[in-house]
Structure formats: C-alpha cells, structure tokens
Amino acid sequence: ATSNSTMTKYGWIDQEALERQKAMSLDRKSDINYPLTPIKTQPVEKPLNIMWIVVDSWRADTFNAETSPNMWNLAQKGQVFNQHYSTGNCTRTGIFGMFYAIPGTYWHGILVNRQTPVFMDRLQALNYDLGIFAAAKLTNPEFDQNVFAKVRNLRISSEGSSPAGLDVGLTEDWLKWYGQRDRSKPAFSFLFYDAPHGYDFPEGYKTQFQPMLKEVNYLKLNNE
C-alpha cells in the first residue's frame, strides 16, 4: 500500500487503473438489490443547479438565528425539511443515507460492489458538472468507492493544518471551481465541512457564548 501511494504521488501509477484493479479483487456479494425497481425518469428541459452544504457533527438545536445567523438567514430563503431522520449517528452511515436513502447496514454490500447511488447516476446522466469538496478525506470512510465511485478526477482531500483551516481551504477551492466551471452545464456542489467534528475554530474567531472550552476531552464528558 505504501509503495502504491508513493508511486501514485510521483505519477508512476494510474490511480484510476489501480482502483479498477482493487475493485476486481473484492469479494463481491449478490445480496444487494439496489434500486429495488427500475428508475423511471422524465425529460428535464433545464436542470437546475443544486448545492448541498453538509456540516459533520452539527447539532440540530444550534441551527437558529442566535447561534448560526448566516446559515439561518440563508435557510429562510428556501424550504426547510425538519421531519427527516438520519440513517445513522456517525459520518459513514449519515452520508450514506443522504445519498442512497437506505439504512447504513447496507454499507458493506454497496461498498464491495462499488454500487453508486441512483441520485449520482441521474446527475451524471443529465450531464451535471460535479463539484465535490470535502474537508476530511473521502477515502476514510470510503466514499470514493461507493457514493463518488464514478466521479472522474475526484478531489479526495483539502489542504490545511487544522479542521478550521481545511474548511477554509474547501470554500476557497469551491469558489475557484464554481467561477471557472462550464456555465453551459448544470452544477451539483457538495460542500462537506468538518470543523464541528474536530471542535476547532479559526484563529481570532469571536466566540458567541462564555465560558467556552478551548479543547474537548471526549473521554471526560458527562451530563454536567
């Protein structure tokens, strides 16, 4: 694995060919029947741009005008669906359910078969320009091998030395991509932020509430 990663870094190995070879060696299962029925579609005259802003480990009760005013104001201009449940309480199963709309218990079967979600397949069939930007690496969990398995030149990771720095880099990269993309095609943007997961803030960030922990030791957390 180390040898492969080193040779890939210097361009001596075709990463896509390597992934195809790995997929061929996986123990494929036959118990996955997804989707259950053939998908019926209708012609779309003018596909709309779609943006998903996803924040890992963000507590739902902090989505309000006081705690997150910018996101709150943005949401007031659209539709809010507040009766939906996550398919899991961790990153792997939560993102999995968002794209596949099935429980996270199907993760392994989908992964070994490299089965992409109907949603992503439909976007690509409609010739969407795909802007996939994540702070954390898309290789752990292995979203590059299921959700985004068919996305060419997938952006695997962000540049930065901290969770907050990775989030900033993600935003800057997306802005650059969106400004230079092919405007003749519709766009799907997936922005996956991670700072709440790592409990990290940009330098000089003005805190909203006091007292406030500088860092969190998860092993010492209790109800008090």
Name what the model sees in each region.
Residues 1-218:
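Active-site-proximal alpha/beta segments of enzymes that process anionic O-linked groups
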